[in-house]
């Protein structure tokens, strides 16, 4: 009997989290639509919606054009302007990018804190605290939590970066323990490409794609696999997949890693070496390649290498869709089409099912990089509602 009570409580909390996810990821939604999509009874919908209204998490509004709605006008449910907000920080080697956003990842405040080339573990942690303080000082709404997205292998249970390369002289960093000393809200840490994949899942192509591979081209190369609308929690370090055992030595200790050939810095270095033109970011490199055949050839060869790396993932997981994000979002459509053709010509797993892999660009574009930090907290809310007191119940 005791176990039954526990299970019932968990079911109620799970139902609350599910309905909140449906409301957060929709511009607006009716109670009837909630019942259909959640497969919960109208009575359950009514009870939970009324609780959310009382807690000022959501509001009910009539549709803009009531004349077109026959019969009783269905009220639209939306996230309330008084609901809690989320703090997000994206940590890169050059800058800390901060944001305060709503439960629908609409930005309210954005602040950046540049990093020097001589940062240490102590200075990085202190600057994270400074930026968080600056962000929360500009909102009087309750803070749901802080999400930090970063490169590296992350232990999400402890909030520790367990291994990171090319990040000053830092190899490990305990973010949660340090920041939890200063803030009462929960702190969550996630690999930045995993975070971007969550953003794509909740607010991008994931709304229609249940299974996909998200590929992020940055200082390195990382990938995240979503199967059955669940993010697989392996490290996703695609860039450290060796494609040439006799190639140059990587910072990870291996040889011929993919990121030495197809990451953003490697592409920029190769263009400079072959054209004499120094470029500083992917956007300028793509523009230059449109008018320079040598630079275009660098892109072509690098993306051919990346295609083999993507194909290895597809052969393992048989996902039909590849979403290109971070700097790979900037790739010319012609290059993306060539990559898709190349992968289709060598892929085995999808061919077995008579299907062809599809490459598409992120629906949210470059915004997934920062908004993903917000989605780290949303994932906890949607999948583990008991982390947040307003979803727990004593019924």
Language model features with spans:
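ATP-binding/phosphotransfer module of carbohydrate and carboxylate kinases, centering on a glycine-rich
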Residues: 1-112, 117-142, 258-395
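Short glycine-aspartate micro-motif
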Residues: 76, 86-90, 143-147, 212-216, ...
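Short, acidic, Ser/Thr-enriched surface-loop or helix-capping motifs
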Residues: 102, 156, 226
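Glycine-rich phosphate-binding loop and adjoining helix at the ATP-binding site
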Residues: 107-117, 121-211, 334-346
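Glycine/GP-enriched mid-protein hinge/lid loop-to-helix segment characteristic of carbohydrate kinases
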Residues: 110, 120-121, 171, 180-290
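Short glycine-rich anion-binding loops that position phosphate/pyrophosphate groups of nucleotides
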Residues: 151-153, 218-220, 328-329
